[in-house]
Amino acid sequence: MSNKDLLPIALGKEKADLVFKNGKIIDVFNEKVIEEDLAISNGVIIGFGKYEGKEEVDLEGKFISPGFIDAHLHLESAMVTIEEFAKTVIPLGTLTLVADPHEIANVAGKVGIKYFLTIGNNIPWNFNLMVPSCVPVTTFDKSGSVLNAEKIKELITEENFFGLGEVMDYEGVITGQDYIWDKIELMKDYFIDGHAPKLQGKILNAYLLAGIMADHETTSPNEALEKISKGMYIMVREGSVTRDLQSLLPAINDKNNCNFLFATDDKHPEDLISEGHINFMIKKAIKLGMEPFRAIKLATLNAARSLGLHRLGGIAPGYKADLLIIDNLDELGIFQVYKDGKKVAENGKALFQVNSNNFERPPTIFHSVNIAPIREEDFKIPKGKTYRVINMIQDQIITGEDFFSFPDSFEEERFIRYNINKIAVVERHKSTGKIGLGLIRGFGLESGAIASSIAHDSHNIIVLGTNSCDMKIAVEKIAEIQGGIVIANNQKIVDFIELPIGGLISTDPIGKVSEKLQELRKIVHNLGVKTNSPFMTLAFMGLPVVPKLKITCDGLYDVENHIFVSLVVN
């Protein structure tokens, strides 16, 4: 049935499939409320006015909102299957998302991307999958797969994709490197997402010549305003580690608010349960002083228009009937969720079922940890006088660079006194035996080791510890369980969580995953760790495109100067 066939319904000559009565329609176009009937047929909005329906629902004064949109996220950060993630966020109002699968792609390449696409397309939401642009994230990083322009061309020929995922290698862009520009040229008619932390001036100008449209790495009002003045959309990010909403709010005003939208980027299961998803960002924006209808507009209409999602993000004739029934605006209590006019969630519970076990389970995804034999000596810090140290910044994925010298003689065990831990990355895709070693200040671990197969973005094994023995056995346990997070102390495994899907994702329900992560977090806090999100923070210490100093399996990398640097300075 086409919209032409719906004309008699729009004109009031025939009954609509569904009519909401006595509701308050949130008009995001004008940031106001319309109190009229809302008619729906064939999955689209017919209009508002006086209508009769085959089914009529009395909303008793409840609000009707467009479905929420997450403009940029990595599903893998939720650490649960896609269907489990959907069952969590759809009842919270998220009906559209733009997902960049570069985590699973770094592990399993095309196989991983297609695995996500197959499952995501069988869920009642608008699933927009990007083609990752940076697999690996840089030319030197050691990932499990490489997606060059040729492979991307194969992917977009075989499947439907929304755009090119965040272009993180800005150095490759501004220096005109063919390996990244070939991908950009191939995807020039698609949405191209950005990753531009602190880029400004002529460097930003050069970066934007690639047709990059948006950025979610902006952290200050001045940075946001410059990027907007140069044509970018700003995805205000509120994840588990990086929380930029409060700092960016002063930049949003009546003249420029249409250039801002919401994104979660990376959110852990505990935070999805305790806080929520895009609904949490709306509530937080309102509490920080933003008008409720404007906050909803950022999460709906602004996102749809910025991303080029036609007939989404608003309540208007011909738009998709992706709707939320909201009890009140103060707490944003979501009573019901409708996708294409069909109820898919009610009272916080999903009304649909999808089982990924019904789909193929590729061995490259479910057996992805392959390490060479390791020794305690691999984690020994070489003797020296002055050391280069990663300086961790609380609640941020950016780091600083520091230097440390022992006041007298070298003694590895004394690093802990100065709030310094050892950190290493162990290559886990091709058993090369590569191990990069460094030091980090600010994590606070006083005893033992923490290892994880989640290490953005190449997802080798990252391990942080106070001693070589615990670091070794923690890494070996990761290999034994084929991915996960492991805590070791006093030469024993204390606890762990298994992440068998690419070493990134659990097969357990989100509640169980959240409980286990809370248990693990309590253990590491008892071992002295200070950071609020220890496992996600650790995972980002290996991302060599976010300043300043990061660790890879090839050693310490200075992101701003684009060079590997030594651990021992003299």
From Swiss-Prot:
Query: Which EC class, in a word?
Result: hydrolase
This entry's Gene Ontology molecular function terms read:
adenine deaminase activity
Catalysed reactions, semicolon-separated: adenine + H2O + H(+) = hypoxanthine + NH4(+)
Q: Which cofactor does it need?
A: Mn(2+)
Say which domain of life the source belongs to.
Answer: Bacteria
- Which keywords does this Swiss-Prot/TrEMBL entry list? Hydrolase, Manganese
Q: Which GO terms describe its biological process?
A: adenine catabolic process
Q: What is its EC number?
A: 3.5.4.2
Q: Which family does it belong to?
A: Belongs to the metallo-dependent hydrolases superfamily. Adenine deaminase family.
Alphabetical list of PANTHER family matching this protein: ADENINE DEAMINASE, N-ACETYLGLUCOSAMINE-6-PHOSPHATE DEACETYLASE
NCBIfam families hit by this protein = ade
The protein, known as: Adenine deaminase
Species: Petrotoga mobilis (strain DSM 10674 / SJ95)
